């Protein structure tokens, strides 16, 4: 769905933030005056999708936070804003500007979804049809809370339509376990009612809900259920119109992604759209090479740049490295130069390979790659295979099925490179050996796709990956503090029921 049709009326249904929730007007139209048809219900849900695509959520603030918090992307341009450095260096406080931007935007997504869910009963239409549309709202709510709970732990959990901010002025935090219960319930509803396929990957399907259930169960350590949900998707590839794309590069080409079969869910951008922050994508900009004149949309900003060790430790024969990282740039005179000379062409660049997944083929885009036409893929079929592999190995050490799923991804990588690398893994491995291989495969296959921090957190890898021998040593990392972000300080000032903040903040 390349364009979200958001009317002023729909935007008025959105209530954002948390304690005072920076209320947008909600009383212009009563719900019973708006929600009359399934088209009205869909229009309201489209408000959630639009809120996902804003600069303050997927367009930069949330995604850049996830990139920098992991060990695959470091700060490049040292003159970039302090709030980004704080996220990267584990020195952030409760006044961090990244968090204060995506926190209220997340609750805007949730608020719009709640309006749709609460008012679906007003629609006079076939119940099955209404439920199938409403299931999208359940998915949007679960998707957003799944990000929040992993980042913050205990959070306010609002699952009802808010018509007056006073209803939640004194809301308290909900324990993490209860938030997960709500997420699972929403995804189960979505899995039951969503169709097998949609006309666009920007709309969730039954397989999307199952894939996220698998991810949630894996995060919770329920390996049996994680395997069941992942294999439900895998065993029904044809039914759900899924496959691994033959060419890994096509997953990160804005001109290709709309027709791909691998994505289970996408967040779409139109290109050169910048009205009120909706549809604004800056991920290409912040990851692109400063001083590079290769693309007509201009140079990047060299903000989030992998450490040199990320490039050096990555098997040079693995096609995924060539797709994931740019090692050359082009001067204004047309000269192609290597990453070792990036700083010669811009004082703000750094002599390290840059993330290529978003900047290389940004499609129709504004200056510096802003406002690209990229379809970002929060969940794709490759990850489902990796979830199944990890869960099956935990259930049955060295599972041959787990090995086969990993090898499917390696085979795809070999097709791209035309070489024998990466080699297949063999059966008969010990559980720890296969576990380490699968986690490494996740790191490589899903590099820079906003997953790595969540893996570091759930596996408690912080001391290892941020230690002296890690890809990105971070001496400030504190395992007692840094697996959670701080709740925004102003929210706690306005509502003391949200106190105390997370430990260490």
Curated annotation (Swiss-Prot):
Lipid-substituted positions (S-diacylglycerol cysteine): 18
Residue ranges annotated as transmembrane are none
Q: Which UniProt keywords apply?
A: Cell outer membrane, Lipoprotein, Membrane, Palmitate, Signal
Name the principal localization, coarsely classed: membrane
Q: Name one Pfam family in it.
A: SusD-like_3
Query: Which InterPro entries does this entry report, sorted A to Z?
Result: SusD-like_N, SusD_RagB_dom, TPR-like_helical_dom_sf
An example of a Gene Ontology cellular component annotation for this protein is: cell outer membrane
The induction text for this entry reads: By ulvan and rhamnose.
Location comes to: Cell outer membrane
**Which residue numbers carry lipidation of type N-palmitoyl cysteine?**
18
List the residue ranges forming a coiled coil, or say none.
Answer: none
Q: How does it sit in the membrane?
A: Lipid-anchor
SUPFAM superfamilies per the record?
Answer: TPR-like (SSF48452)
Q: Where is the signal peptide?
A: 1-17
- Superkingdom of the source species: Bacteria
> Belongs to which family?
Belongs to the SusD family.
- What does the record give as the function of this protein? Polysaccharide-binding protein probably involved in ulvan degradation. Ulvan is the main polysaccharide component of the Ulvales (green seaweed) cell wall. It is composed of disaccharide building blocks comprising 3-sulfated rhamnose (Rha3S) linked to D-glucuronic acid (GlcA), L-iduronic acid (IduA), or D-xylose (Xyl). The SusD-like protein may mediate ulvan oligomer-binding before transport in the periplasm for further degradation.
Q: What is this protein called?
A: SusD-like protein P2
